[in-house]
């Protein structure tokens, strides 16, 4: 049976999405291990960045010999706070490794392919257009030392940003989506004018993700932020 590698790589990206924005300086990676065209194990980068996805997927007593490993980013090959994932891949007898992105960390970038000279492991880089921007923020920070910034704007169909008849311009789906996005970011910047008008909380209110609150920065040049706002009651840190 011919293997559709993209199916397993897309599954790996879905796993990587789970902890996106919650792995600190490490990228959120997803890993899927396949044997005889069936998934036998999966893992993602843990909260705060460790253990890595490959370790979590391979940390089992089942046999991984001659299995295929699918991972969103090339496995690390350097010693840091944890041993390199490449060591565990060799130890477990993985036969083939498929990945989508080279890491930009100079300690490991494009070095995983060198293990093929030590062991007969087939290594192949696959491109999935749908996920070409998945690590955009990680690459921007590490390559250019720049912050990754998104802008959130609510606009009506007729291009207005205020509707006097309704509290929201957006629907419940888009509002929930915004809460999810907030959990993936480190900080939110808003203005005192906007917060005074909406009395917005600017946090994540999805069960299970509500503890991932981005830091809040308010631009208030004239010190007009009201004292009785909801944001003043939800967290001392913010």
Locations of regions flagged by a protein language model:
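Short hydrophobic alpha-helix segments
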Residues: 41-43, 165
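Short beta-strand scaffold segments in enzyme catalytic cores
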Residues: 28-37, 153-154
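Zinc-dependent deaminase
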Residues: 1-23, 79-238
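Local cysteine-cluster metal-coordination motifs and their immediate loop/turn environment
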Residues: 51-52, 69-89
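Hydrophobic "anchor" residues
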Residues: 39-40, 161
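Short helix-loop-beta connector
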Residues: 63-67, 184
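Acidic, glycine-enriched active-site microenvironments
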Residues: 3, 8, 24-32, 67-68
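A short, polar/charged loop-to-alpha-helix boundary motif
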Residues: 46-61, 173-179
